[in-house]
Amino acid sequence: MLGEKHVGSSLENLNDFNADFQNFISRFAWGEVWSRPGMPRHTRSLVTIAMLLALGREDELRMHLRACFNNGVTKDDLKELILHCSLYAGLPAANAAMHMAEEVFANLGIAPQKLSEQQLSQEQMNQE
């Protein structure tokens, strides 16, 4: 779900204080809930991102924005999800998520392309 890089990082950060908690997360969240039949991982990713956006859980949101591509989520899926969440979670939360998504895209080498002059003109006309 989160990819081998995240798993490796989690294992490297285990210590005598957090090991039981990390084990619980691995067994319950990933082993039980995320592995259940009945809802595709693509959908689980989108639902999770929407909830984290609404709750303002930025660290977890960044992690799931990176990981969602492992579950078949696309940039267009995220764009529509964030736009939709702006109605129910508020514009500030959605705006923060939009910026986080753009940062994640840049880190993954899939940064959005700038609009052409023609596209910019069309956008301006649409706003008038």
Language-model features: locations:
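Mid-chain, well-packed structural core segment of small domains
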Residues: 54-79
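Substrate/cofactor-recognition hotspot
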Residues: 84, 91-95
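Acidic, glycine/proline-rich low-complexity segments that act as flexible tails and inter-domain linkers
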Residues: 1-42, 70, 96-128
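A short, ordered amphipathic alpha-helix with a cationic face
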Residues: 19-20, 52-56
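Alpha-helical transition-metal enzyme core signature, strongest for iron centers
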Residues: 54, 88-91
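Short, structured motif recognition centered on aromatic/hydrophobic residues
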Residues: 44-52, 81-82
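Buried hydrophobic packing segments
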Residues: 50-51, 64, 85, 101
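Short, low-complexity cationic-aromatic patches
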Residues: 37-45, 57, 75-79, 92
